[in-house]
Swiss-Prot record:
Key component of the proton channel; it plays a direct role in the translocation of protons across the membrane. GO terms for molecular function: proton-transporting ATP synthase activity, rotational mechanism. Residues 281-290 have a biased composition (Basic and acidic residues). SUPFAM superfamilies: F1F0 ATP synthase subunit A. CDD domains: ATP-synt_Fo_a_6. Residues 281-303 are annotated as: Disordered. It is a multi-pass membrane protein. It is found in: Cell inner membrane. This is ATP synthase subunit a. Keywords: ATP synthesis, Cell inner membrane, Cell membrane, CF(0), Hydrogen ion transport, Ion transport, Membrane, Transmembrane, Transmembrane helix, Transport. PANTHER family: ATP SYNTHASE SUBUNIT A.
Length: 303
């Protein structure tokens, strides 16, 4: 007996291969990538079965396209003439405004005036790359690369690596490892070190899930509202769904900017925390030994 309910299958986890690019599968064990028949036809096993899929997907193409558009934007509106300090044109002014915002409000404010400029190129790259990928996802027949968990995880991994490098550079390898002990007695290290290491990975995990969930959720709501028109098949539904879908579309444009800003801001905040950890270690490692002789000289002068 047929079910009275309408069943809709949305394969969110399956890769979407773009155009007719050749597929590339790397077997992690012998015979792992051999095609097999399923209820949906012939399929290639996944990573859990020992087959690594390195094929070009639609999200991969979107990342390439975002990078090309970003480079073209910088080439067209970037001020290549060093003698002209004032940008000309609306595009150049908007670009300069965003660059100065990332430098002053994100890098310098969260990392510091001395160390902040060092990380401005990374923060600018993250901000504009995510922004362009988000905006491409709003174009019909395109895909939102930031709605892919693997993409957001890779971006968060970049921030994680930069954050750890910043901490090691500021505190030194010894100071960085000492920070993992939390400054507690050695007999508490077996408890404190795993907690600190877990804390290191919660930050990139939060970056991954925040960007992924926000970009995916908005598009699901948007397509659900439009899908109601075809599911219910009544003209009156369109009068309600279309205005709501348009409102969600405008909201998604705003969210595209906000999520790029939030990711860059949190990246700057995490880098600033690592740099501050190094300065805190230097203060405790150098200021206190110098206080001893000064204190002794003060007592001798008083005597």
């Amino acid at each position: 007996m047929d079910s009275p309910y309408l069943e809709i299958e949305v394969p969110l986890s399956s890769p979407i291969h773009a155009f007719d690019f050749p597929q590339w599968h790397v077997p992690l064990k012998a015979g792992a990538c051999a095609p097999r028949m399923t209820e949906h036809g012939e399929e290639i096993p996944g990573l859990m079965d020992g087959c690594l899929d390195l094929s070009i997907t639609k999200h991969t193409v979107m990342m390439w396209l975002a990078a090309l558009l970003l480079m073209a934007t910088l080439f067209i509106w970037g001020n290549r003439d060093k003698t002209k300090l004032v940008p000309r044109g609306a595009g150049a002014n908007i670009l300069e405004m965003l660059v100065l915002f990332v430098r002053d409000e994100l890098a310098i404010k969260n990392i510091g005036k001395e160390e902040g400029p060092r990380y401005v190129p990374f923060l600018l790259t993250v901000f504009f790359f995510i922004l362009f990928m988000n905006m491409l996802g709003m174009v019909p027949w395109m895909a939102t690369a930031t709605g892919n968990l693997a993409v957001t995880m890779a971006l968060a991994l970049c921030t994680f690596v930069i954050t750890q490098v910043a901490g090691i550079r500021a505190a030194g390898l010894g100071g960085y490892l000492k920070h993992l002990t939390g400054g507690v007695a050695p007999w508490l290290w077996p408890i404190m070190v795993p907690v600190e290491v877990l804390g290191l990975f919660t930050k990139p995990f939060a970056l991954t899930m925040r960007l992924f969930a926000n970009m995916l959720a908005g598009h699901i709501v948007y397509f659900f509202l439009l899908g109601l028109i075809f599911l219910l098949g009544h003209p009156a539904v369109a009068a309600v769904s279309v205005p709501f879908a348009f409102a969600i579309f405008l909201l998604e444009l705003f969210v595209a900017f906000v999520q790029a800003y939030v990711f860059a801001m949190l990246s700057a905040l995490f880098i600033g925390m690592s740099v501050a950890m190094g300065h805190h270690h230097d203060d405790h490692g150098h200021d206190h030994p110098e206080a001893g002789p000064s204190h002794d000289q003060g007592k001798a002068h008083h005597a």
